[in-house]
Structure formats: structure tokens, C-alpha cells
């Protein structure tokens, strides 16, 4: 598994299980010669067009972002028709068996959420600015009540 991280987070990300870590501050991961079966852009910093050359013949690109002008939704609808590289766009659904499965993973220690910072509801503006800064590592939690 390969991922990107800042130089100061490389060892931490390796502890989480990454085999290869690319420092996004000094290297452009889209310039690598490595081919991938799956690329997951969790922060919306890339695009299918940028990542397509990095995907294997049947590779999949998934992003949590809509992309420029909603392009990821368009690609998700049309790329499966051509049988090669494709885009998946996550559409959340509530499914009890998925929640139970996630609960079991957490209880067994297989899934450890990475929490960067906690904010109160009164600090929502500060939390938003921090997330938008691109400096967060993991999740930012907004506490609604104690």
C-alpha cells in the first residue's frame, strides 16, 4: 500500500501499515511510474484525469469530492460502460450490518480511527479553518455535547 503524507508524518503513516509513503510537500505522486489497482483520494487533491495513467488496466479511482464541475459523478456514470479504468463515487447509505461490522473491527483493534483534534460547537469556525488549511492529519471531531 502506498500513500502520501507530510515529512513529519511519514513514520506515523508507516506504523498504520503503509509500505510506501510519498512526501506530498516535495513530490508529486502523479509522476510515479508505479501502477495501482485502486486510488482513493480522501481529500480531493487529485482528479481522475491526473490519476488515470497510474491505474492498472481495470483500476479504480474513488474520491470523496465531486471534482471540478461535478466531473467525478459524470465519470462514475460513464466509465463503467467502457470496461477499463473506472471511477466510483461514494454514496453513503445506512446499513445495520455495516455498522455492526465496523463495531467489530474497532473492538478487535483492526480499525483505529485517527483523531487529529477535538473542537466544541462554539469553536466551529476555528475547526472549519483548520480543516480548510490542509494541515490536518486524520479526523477533526466536533463535540456537540458532553
Residue ranges and their predicted role:
Residues 1-146:
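Terminal helix/beta-alpha structural elements that buttress the NAD(P)+-binding lobe
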Amino acid at each position: 500500500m502506498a500513500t502520501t503524507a507530510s515529512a513529519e508524518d511519514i513514520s506515523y503513516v508507516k506504523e498504520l501499515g503503509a509500505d510506501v509513503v510519498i512526501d506530498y510537500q516535495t513530490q508529486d505522486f502523479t509522476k510515479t511510474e508505479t501502477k495501482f489497482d485502486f486510488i482513493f483520494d480522501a481529500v480531493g487533491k487529485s482528479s481522475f484525469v491526473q490519476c488515470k495513467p497510474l491505474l492498472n488496466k481495470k483500476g479504480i479511482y474513488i474520491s470523496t469530492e465531486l471534482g471540478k464541475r461535478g466531473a467525478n459523478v459524470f465519470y462514475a456514470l460513464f466509465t463503467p460502460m467502457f470496461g477499463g479504468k473506472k471511477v466510483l463515487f461514494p454514496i453513503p447509505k445506512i446499513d445495520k450490518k455495516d455498522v455492526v461490522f465496523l463495531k467489530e473491527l474497532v473492538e478487535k483493534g483492526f480499525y483505529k480511527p485517527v483523531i487529529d483534534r477535538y473542537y466544541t460547537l462554539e469553536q466551529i469556525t476555528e475547526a472549519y479553518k483548520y480543516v480548510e488549511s490542509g494541515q490536518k492529519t486524520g479526523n477533526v471531531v466536533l463535540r456537540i455535547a458532553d
